[in-house]
Amino acid sequence: MISNEFNRNVTKDPPYPGLHWGGHGHDPQQVKKAGAAFLRGGAFKPRTSPYDFQGLGEEGIRLLLEAKKATGLPIVTELMDIRNLPLFEQVDVIQVGARNTQNFDMLKELGKTDKPILLKRGLAGTIKELLMSAEYIMASGNEKVILCERGIRTYESTYTRNTLDLSVVPVLKGLTHLPVVVDPSHATGHAHLVEPMAMAAAAAGADGIMIELHNDPPHALCDGAQSLTPEQFAHTAGKIFRIREAMEG
């Protein structure tokens, strides 16, 4: 399913080429106009503190479905508890967050579904651990896996939220046939760092880029510090597309 090194070898083309991702807390029509191919929003939010905003739950999924209907864009949201899987029937892509990357029982159950799975790298996960988590899903029957680099925990925490490991993009693309997405928002934790790292991810060959958005970042209930405005996103997306055009030309 992934490579000879990991006991599988599937040489199919990536099933989701050319992805570009929008975040949440924004006008979805603006994001679509800027070039986003998917909308992602957190209905269930994994937070370090139990006192922080935990998401809207089932109501959040309903709002995502409204955005899907309005724009025609497929939606992505995170599953935190396998017992909530029935609520995700109309969700197009299920995200497995960094905290659940090695929740093997969940991965096995997701392997029994037919939905694409966006699998984030663990907080301090190695490349091999990420690939083994992908194998859990694929060995259970679901080969629609998308790998996501979202930054790993290192000794640096003063100036960045995590450390974005861009080398993982060519490494994973060399080892696997699976699409590789980069999340510079969670990796850096700061809006002013998102654009340069998104551009670097595009240059490294990422198949998709996930960017957090909000109409009013200072007043966002979560992740405001790393969120771009829709206008900033449109500017950044334009640069990303030009990089990809230059690489393809």
Where does each model-flagged region fall?
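Conserved anion-binding
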Residues: 43, 47, 100-167
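Hydrophobic faces of well-ordered beta-strands that scaffold small-molecule active sites
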Residues: 12-20, 37-41, 75-77, 94-96, ...
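Alpha-helix-loop-beta-strand connector modules within alpha/beta enzyme cores
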Residues: 53-77, 109-116, 166-181, 226-249
